[in-house]
Amino acid sequence: MNHLTAMSELSAAEITELLREAKAIKEGTVRHDLAGKFVANLFFEPSTRTRFSFEVAEKKLGMNVLSLDDTSTSVQKGESLYDTVKTLESIGADACVIRHSTDEYYKDLTGRVNIPILNAGDGCGQHPTQSLLDLMTIQEEFETFQGLTVSIHGDIKHSRVARSNAEVLTRLGARVLFSGPPQWQDEKNAFGTCVQTDEAIQASDVVMLLRIQNERHQTEADQKGYLEAYGLTAKRAESMKRHAIIMHPAPVNRGVEIDTTLVECGKSRIFKQMENGVYIRMAVLKRALQTNVKRGEAAYVLSH
């Protein structure tokens, strides 16, 4: 069963394969490789990029898309997530894409349902497709991860993007630096070194900004002065390496974690990340719907 719930599930070879497939899709002609398949998108947290990127990817592949949220399912009536997914499986869904506020919600599903679960973000846990599209964007720029320095700035403790990226980038040979307010450092994340903001920016090939995750804080953070203290200001951007790039998983809070003039500057790859997200999610969907042994379906072969 080709679930994708965390980056740690993927070997380096599998990551390379997904990146290669996404590149082939981007450079080639889109085919309706999954025509006739049904996918259910269950988003229990707000989402623009991930939700609609998945939906575009699914429709480009010819899939039938069922889009659901917490107001349109029986979860509102007390039904468990497992029973919801099992219901969708029973009526013919071939895969489920799920975003949920609970960390590791998928542990109650994998091994119990007979369709692939694709994690579109779990609480403060993991965001594997975001990590893959970030890898694709970095690879397009530098061709390799080996020897790169990637700094991740901001609300590290509450960021599933930071958690997914730090692990996989370290595994692929990059050095990861963390920077941000001390209270938002993640003591459990062993895949990066905490340094001062200016030092991190000057040392980096990739400067990755994160928004403040107010929805995961007990009290709303004070954003006054945050940009000058911890964000990417225009002055700090001048100290970046000549070839360095700026990334952000979005949504972007302009003027908070990044100066508004930098969002679409020459070094920015923020909207390129969003574009690459469609191709990565197409590759992930194709991987998920290769031979489903329990259903006895034919394999979908990657295109390259």
Swiss-Prot record:
Pathway: Pyrimidine metabolism; UMP biosynthesis via de novo pathway; (S)-dihydroorotate from bicarbonate: step 2/3. Keywords: Pyrimidine biosynthesis, Transferase. Disulfide bonds: none annotated. One of its GO terms (biological process) is 'de novo' pyrimidine nucleobase biosynthetic process. Carbamoyl phosphate binds at R49, T50, R99, H127, Q130, A250, P251. L-aspartate binds at K77, R160, R211. Gene3D superfamilies: Aspartate/ornithine carbamoyltransferase. Its EC number is 2.1.3.2. Heterododecamer (2C3:3R2) of six catalytic PyrB chains organized as two trimers (C3), and six regulatory PyrI chains organized as three dimers (R2). Catalyzes the condensation of carbamoyl phosphate and aspartate to form carbamoyl aspartate and inorganic phosphate, the committed step in the de novo pyrimidine nucleotide biosynthesis pathway. This is Aspartate carbamoyltransferase catalytic subunit. It comes from Bacillus velezensis (strain DSM 23117 / BGSC 10A6 / LMG 26770 / FZB42) (Bacillus amyloliquefaciens subsp. plantarum).
